[in-house]
A protein has these predicted regions:
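Solvent-exposed coil/turn segments that connect beta secondary-structure elements
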Residues: 86, 113-115, 122, 158-162, ...
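A glycine-rich helix N-cap at a beta->alpha junction
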Residues: 214-231
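Bacterial N-terminal signal peptides that target proteins for export
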Residues: 1-9
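N-terminal amphipathic, basic helical "cap/leader" segment at the start of enzyme domains
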Residues: 22-151
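Bacterial N-terminal signal peptides
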Residues: 9-21
Length: 231
C-alpha cells in the first residue's frame, strides 16, 4: 500500500512539473516569445470582463458590416478586440478560443493608420511591426474590397500550421481552420458588444497579403477582418 501511494505521489509531482512547462514539449498553451532589444512594444489596456450587452443580444445584433465612418478605434477598443480573438484567460495559458491540443497556431495582426501591430497574448501586448499604413496594400491584395480600405482597423488572422502538425499530422489543416473560425467569431461578437461592426473576408491573394505585411514565410493568412464604427 505504501509503495503504491509513493508511486502515485511521484506521478502527481511529475505531472505538475510538466503542466507548468518544466518539461519541453508538454503542451502548456503558451508559445515562447523571445524579446529583442530592438522590438518596439505597446502595452495594451487590461481587457474588460463585463460589457453592456448580453451574449444573446450580441448574437442577435451581429451582421456583416462593410461601410464605416472615419472615426479611429481607441487603444482600449483595439486591446479588447485582440483579447477577444486570442487573449489568455487562465494561468496555464488557455485562451478565449479553443485550440486542438492547446497548441495555439494562430497569430493575430492589426493594421491601422498608425502602423501594423502583432498581438502577443503573453503579457497582453503588441509588437510594432511597421509604422506605415498598410491598409491600401491589403485592399489591393483583397480584390479591392472597399471595406478593407475604409475600416480604421483591419485584423489579420494567420496560421503557423507546423505547431499543430507536430501532433496531429494531416488533420492539422482542419483543426487550424476550425480554430481560425472560432477566433474570428469571437472578434466579430466583441466588435458588436463595443458598438462596432466588421466583416470576415476570405477572398484575397495570400502571397500579396504576406508580402504587404512582411509576414514570416510560415505565417499563412486565413482572414482579413475590417472593423470600425458603423456608417
Amino acid at each position: 500500500m505504501r509503495t503504491w501511494c509513493y508511486k502515485l505521489l511521484i506521478f502527481a509531482s511529475v505531472l505538475s512539473l510538466a503542466m507548468t512547462g518544466c518539461f519541453p514539449g508538454f503542451p502548456t498553451g503558451v508559445q515562447e516569445v523571445t524579446a529583442s532589444p530592438q522590438v518596439e512594444e505597446v502595452a495594451l489596456p487590461a481587457p474588460r470582463l463585463k460589457g453592456e450587452m448580453s451574449l444573446e443580444e450580441t448574437l442577435a445584433a451581429r451582421r456583416s458590416v462593410r461601410q464605416f465612418t472615419e472615426t479611429e478605434l481607441t487603444l482600449e477598443e483595439i486591446s479588447q478586440l485582440l483579447w477577444a480573438a486570442q487573449g489568455i484567460t487562465v494561468a496555464w495559458g488557455g485562451r478565449t478560443a479553443p485550440s486542438a491540443g492547446a497548441l495555439y497556431p494562430l497569430e493575430v495582426y492589426v493594421a491601422t493608420a498608425d502602423g501594423l501591430y502583432h498581438y502577443v497574448p503573453q503579457g497582453h501586448q503588441a509588437i510594432v511591426e511597421s509604422r506605415a499604413d498598410l491598409r491600401d496594400e491589403l485592399w489591393q491584395a483583397g480584390l479591392s474590397q472597399n471595406a478593407i480600405r475604409e475600416a480604421p482597423a483591419v485584423f489579420v488572422i494567420t496560421a503557423v500550421y507546423a505547431r499543430t502538425e507536430k501532433k496531429y499530422g494531416e488533420r492539422a489543416e482542419r483543426y487550424v481552420k476550425l480554430e481560425a473560425g472560432h477566433a474570428a467569431q469571437n472578434l466579430l461578437l466583441q466588435a458588436v458588444a463595443l458598438g462596432l461592426g466588421g466583416v470576415p473576408i476570405g477572398a484575397f491573394y495570400d502571397d500579396q497579403v504576406q508580402s504587404a505585411l512582411s509576414l514570416p514565410s510560415d505565417h499563412e493568412p486565413l482572414y482579413l477582418i475590417p472593423i470600425g464604427h458603423l456608417r
